[in-house]
Amino acid sequence: MAALIAENFRFLSLFFKSKDVMIFNGLVALGTVGSQELFSVVAFHCPCSPARNYLYGLTAIGVPALALFLIGVILNNHTWNLVAECQYRRAKNCSAAPTFLLLSSILGRAAVAPVTWSVISLLRGEAYVCALSEFVDPSSLTAGDEGFPPDHATEILARFPCGEGPANLSGFREEVSRRLKYESQLFGWLLIGVVAILVFLTKCFKHYCSPLSYRQEAYWAQYRTNEDQLFQRTAEVHSRVLAANNVRRFFGFVALNKDDEELVTKFPVEGTQPRPQWNAITGVYLYRENQGLPLYSRLHKWAQGLTGNGTAPDNVEMALLTV
């Protein structure tokens, strides 16, 4: 049963890794929407106190968005490829334009969840109403022929998000809530429009600057997906067999289940890869060509003998497009 569950999780992992990034971004957005709804129901409680409302409302919108953004940056493999590139090669082979595009890719993917959080927060309007209710101009409020009483206006307005305040001012409370929710939702829709325009322009710029045809770009994407899946699967088997060999040398035997016995028999491991080889296949990769032939990854480049003491130096390759 445990093996079946593990196999199902492995299948789901490979399934999502093999799909287009837009599907993944959509799932991230849906998860963020659910989290925001849960937060609004369970954790959001406006203090309804002057000065505190503003800090609490902005914190409720900004801090979760910042946390989601940092998590997105941390979970993006390109982030650590860029770190490795700076550590091992000082990014000497990356020109300004590809580096900018790569950073844009990292930040763009990391921004999906925080932008979704901010948009949903603004469309709901609760945090915005909480933050700005005390700053509404009392002289602009009217309920019939009556104006808002100027005495203690800030304290009264700060209590409106909680439905509190003098009973004779309930009409003003509804007007304040309606006005601030209008502003909040307006900003939310504007944010959606700005993000949509930026995504459209980024896609256009990417395809306009790409020297590759659509079919070759699709092939390159398929190659990267397949290489990553095969590499991860092979690395798991290699590490398991190597661990079994080392345990056998220490104890004189190793307790293996049937699947592990088949792996050890079918895939004998004699040694490990030296650190320079790992460094050679790790880091930022740009589409490059060598003598007119494409090199689709650092592993592909290493396999062709074009790194380290290989037959061709890095500078004969042409950096064309970021991944």
Curated annotation (Swiss-Prot):
InterPro entries: CALHM
TM region(s), chain numbering: 22-43, 53-76, 102-132, 180-206
Record's protein name: Calcium homeostasis modulator protein 2
Ranges in the topological domain labelled Cytoplasmic: 1-21, 77-101, 207-323
Source lineage: Eukaryota, Metazoa, Chordata, Craniata, Vertebrata
Organism: Rattus norvegicus
Subunit note: Homo-undecamer. Two undecameric hemichannels can assemble in a head-to-head manner to form a gap junction.
Region called Central pore, residue ranges: 14-39
Site positions per UniProt: Not N-glycosylated: N168
Domain of life: Eukaryota
Region spans: Intersubunit interaction: 214-251
GO cellular component: plasma membrane
UniProt catalytic activity: ATP(in) = ATP(out)
